[in-house]
């Protein structure tokens, strides 16, 4: 059923571990860039194929495992090593071609704005690395997902991820001082809503640590 298919697609979200795995992005424009920005951060080995590739995508090569192939997509380009293909182009017939090949090989395929050609969908992401908030409409309305993401973007501070960094710094010491799980949970709930959190969000982790441990 459609509901069952949506649940299956939802299971494979964009937090899947792709480190050192081969992925293909078809398209070299703004949409492809959005997909690439999260994909390269997973540590995936990514190939981009498109007749024209945006300068912002080219710039990603400097720090990430990214291979650029400046040519029109052909079925031969989708080789068996690719575990995931993202089709981010409106070139006629390309999404259908890529979908047919990927499905036949039992691989994951996501065609932007074509949920009928996807066996994996990706939620809209609010990125406060390493905190990531995923918003999904299960493929019913990508525009709604992006709208909700916009609401959250306005409300979640840019430094929110620093709270996770603070937790990482204090992980071992809190386990030693507070061996009881419930006590440790209460401690963190207090920290995340107090002055230590404010300091961390402002990127003053030393001050945040002092406030947390005083």
Regions found by a protein language model. Give the residues of each.
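ADP-ribose/adenylate-binding Rossmann-like module
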Residues: 84-89, 95-122
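Residue-level detector of alpha-helix initiation sites
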Residues: 29-31, 92-93, 139
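Glycine-rich adenosine-cofactor-binding loop
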Residues: 14-40, 166-174, 184
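Single conserved hydrophobic/aromatic residue that forms the stacking wall/gate
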Residues: 1-11
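NAD(P)-binding Rossmann-fold cofactor-contacting core
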Residues: 34, 42-60
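An accessory alpha-helical subdomain
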Residues: 139-214
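Conserved SAM/SAH-binding loop
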Residues: 71-75
């Amino acid at each position: 059923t459609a509901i069952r298919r949506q649940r299956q697609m939802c299971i494979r979200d964009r937090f899947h571990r792709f480190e050192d795995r081969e992925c293909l992005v078809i398209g070299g424009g703004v949409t492809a860039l959005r997909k690439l920005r999260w994909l390269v951060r997973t540590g995936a080995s990514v190939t981009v194929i498109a007749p024209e590739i945006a300068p912002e995508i080219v710039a990603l090569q400097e720090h990430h495992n990214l291979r650029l192939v400046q040519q029109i997509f052909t079925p031969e380009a989708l080789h068996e090593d690719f575990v995931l293909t993202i089709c981010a182009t409106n070139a006629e017939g390309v999404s259908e071609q890529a979908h047919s090949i990927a499905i036949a090989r039992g691989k994951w395929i996501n065609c932007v704005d074509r949920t009928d050609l996807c066996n994996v969908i990706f939620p809209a992401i609010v990125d406060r690395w390493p905190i990531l908030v995923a918003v999904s409409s299960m493929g019913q309305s990508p525009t709604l997902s992006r709208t909700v993401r916009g609401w959250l973007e306005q409300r979640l501070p840019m430094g929110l991820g620093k709270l996770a960094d603070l937790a990482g710094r204090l992980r071992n010491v809190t386990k030693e001082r507070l061996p009881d799980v419930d006590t440790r949970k209460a401690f963190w709930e207090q920290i995340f809503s107090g002055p230590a959190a404010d300091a961390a969000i402002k990127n003053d982790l030393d001050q945040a640590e002092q406030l947390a441990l005083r």
